[in-house]
Amino acid sequence: MNITQILSQELSATAAQITAAVELLDDGATVPFIARYRKEATGGLDDTQLRRLAERLQYLRELEERKAVVLKSIEEQGKLSDDLRAQIEAADNKTALEDLYLPYKPKRRTKAQIAREHGLQPLADVLLAEQSQDVEAAAQGYLNENVPDAKAALDGARAILMEQFAEDAELIGTLRDKLWNEAEIHAQVVGGKETEGEKFSDYFDHREPIRAMPSHRALAVLRGRNEGVLNIALKYQPDDTPITQQSEYEQIIARRFKVSDGHKWLRDTVRLTWRAKIFLSLELEALNRLKEAADTDAITVFARNLKDLLLAAPAGRLTTLGLDPGYRNGVKCAVVDDTGKLLDTVIVYLHQENNMLATLSRLIKQHGVKLIAIGNGTASRETDKIAGELVREMSKMGLHKIVVSEAGASIYSASELAAREFPDLDVSLRGAVSIARRLQDPLAELVKIDPKSIGVGQYQHDVNQSQLAKSLDAVVEDCVNAVGVDVNTASAPLLARISGLNQTLAQNIVAYRDENGAFDSRKKLLKVPRLGEKTFEQAAGFLRINGGKEPLDASAVHPEAYPVVAKMLAQQGISAAELIGNRERVKQIKASDFTDERFGLPTILDILSELEKPGRDPRGEFQTASFAEGIHEISDLQVGMILEGVVSNVANFGAFVDIGVHQDGLVHISALSNKFVQDPREVVKAGDVVKVKVLEVDAARKRIALTMRLDDEPGGAKHKMPSENRSRERTAGRKPQRNDRAPANSAMADAFAKLKR
């Protein structure tokens, strides 16, 4: 199959859809642009499908390039048969291709090559083909100045056969698949590391099938190995198997080369090939495969959580007081207006409560503050308590206080971007500005921070960093373009994420705006230096201009489709202002009346949807959690308490919930609902406000077990996974050990815990 056919099969799309999408991508179109404005061409492929297509397209093209290199190399050696060419051209992955290339791949002189140079290839061939003869006698005919005795001859012949066995592509493929499907990974504590590595205690003697090991356990075990606490190995047969007993893998090798059961020398050669050569290579390969799969899974989790946070509902354009709590260095305070512009800053101290109340009260009255955003770090609860007093005392002001995640705020405050924005503002106060702004509009503020610093990733520092960065960049790009931005108020970092734009163009837009005033039309963007027609095509639909000359500029209708809207207006006999936002009028328009060769039904329906509700925001309604009074630390928790919290992170095994005690609790997947849950994201997402019951508290190990099944009783049956969940574990091939899995809601191992960074 060619690349188009492969992608068509993998994405369940037609060849025409794939061809169109590939042509658009090759022409420089972005995924958001294609997904939104080229639905006719791609048959409606969404951004997720297009991202997958782009990723696989790159892989398959690299595979084709590698095939060409391999074919050329083997052909130059004069060893390229028609059968081998066909096998190489049929290889559908890089591993299979490299297996085929291995016997022909230039390599440093091996023992086998030296043996061939000494004339021992015929001996190896004879020993394998004529197994009835005596090996010692056969070796006598191959002695020379480089091969002084029979032992040297047989050692050379063995090296040749071992290399021959180990480079058989079909055999290696069979052994690889068998090992992956049947072997267990075994983790054991390194002697003397029990105390130092206590956080990995769940893995001090842990076994489970490698193919079924979930990403969080795989990454925990691999981290334990990297920190020198755990030894890990692959086990392919019971530990008590006699060392002389032939394994199933050795039997497969023997059958492949027709080695008879009674030929000890050849049997020993097979055993050595497997144990000293093939297994060691496949074990390393399997562990790498486990790591890659775990990385992919963890990155997917991170990306989903990031998307949920970026698309969290904004509190809106209200003057906001941001509080960055602290004890010794005080509570840093910053007031921003409804556009996010900094108005005032001050530092107050918790131990000077009266002064703090008076100062904050003055700020609130002076600037007409409507929202108080409180960072959720150190001293958050004490700061929240004082903010609560202000809300009560100033009830006529219509104040609201909200605790928000401050993850990444300190990194932003020390960044070059923050320094450019606030060159004269103390670094410590910049974080308070970020906290205030992220309440007003999470997306606009969080794009300024490295996604890895937002604190919603599972083992984000353990996974492939380039793959992680690529995935997260795609998420940010998709989120920003899904919402769209106001070109007259957006920051350069936000504009840089728009389809077709980059940092340079974003800065040029801001500079042009600062010098010439607000843009009054999308067309004016073409006056920005280096912003040409192609870039305009990619970006214009995602850039909004409110209150401009053209009402459609405030919508997601692309300028290329304005003539279509003009036809609609002419048919209805009304102006754009009369149609936009007028649901009844829009409903009177028949979409099929306006389709043509360029604009099909999907685009016309999108236009009508946008006209009905222009500039619609895909983000939900703003909501907040109310943390319980008097619950500030983990020591304040009692089993049985029912609390309100915010989902901070969703993993494959459950959801972490911030209940205001500086340590997130875990709702295991089995405690998310009374119904069977396949994926935690079916029930919750990052940012959701939920009610939970405390099931277990281990203050020493900082573990909090929670449940969303509020009728669960601590110590009762809920500490066992529901039978349906156990069934799922079995069907997935998992074999969790008792020392690996604590009761279903015991907050899991520290190694599973989200690291808030």
Curated annotation (Swiss-Prot):
GO terms for molecular function: mRNA binding; structural constituent of ribosome. Residues 710-757 are annotated as: Disordered. Residues 710-741 have a biased composition (Basic and acidic residues). Keywords: RNA-binding. This is Uncharacterized protein NMA0194. One of its GO terms (cellular component) is cytosol. InterPro entries: HHH_9, NA-bd_OB-fold, Ribos_protein_bS1-like, RNaseH-like_sf, RuvA_2-like, S1_domain, S1_Tex, Tex-like_central_region. The lineage of its organism: Bacteria, Pseudomonadati, Pseudomonadota, Betaproteobacteria, Neisseriales. GO terms for biological process: nucleobase-containing compound metabolic process; translation. Residues 640-709 form the S1 motif domain.
